[in-house]
Amino acid sequence: MKHFSHSKLALIALTLASSFATSGALADYRLTAFSDTVGFKALVDGDLAATKSTFTSHSLKRMDYFEANNLCVAQILLEEFESAITSCTSALEKAETSSELTIKNEKVALASVYSNLAVAKAITGDTVGASVDLEMALSLNQKDGNASINYDLISTNLVAGS
């Protein structure tokens, strides 16, 4: 069973946000990876080649939702956005059948996955879908700083695009 640490989650979210700006479109968005799971160390180290290699040998079907989320983050950083949408969606589906977390921690974790999904959608041009996902993230955890920042960015883009 994986143990979820909110303080580690927040720290990792900030680390990923400040360390990975692979493209102009991605530079301002914030991503969250889960610690103590596949791909985490390579993500934190900023080694995208190692991250990709780590996930190459793993099947999305066999991953739990922590791992599927980290795969989603890796795919966003590697600019494989459609694959990231699939991985984040899978993480959300897997979370529905998981009993690894308490209800409170599950909401915090799900909010992070929805926020990551929203980033992938926004970058592919689906800002309306991204906005809906971020509203869901914030309804699950209104204190999610990454979701708040991402929501503000997407809302600004929606207004500018009107």
Model feature map: region roles:
Residues 30-60, 70:
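Alpha-helical segment of the N-proximal tetratricopeptide repeat
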Residues 56-62, 93-108:
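Flexible helix-coil transition and linker loops at the boundaries of alpha-helical arrays
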Residues 127-162:
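Terminal, low-structured helical/coil segments at or just beyond the last alpha-helical repeat
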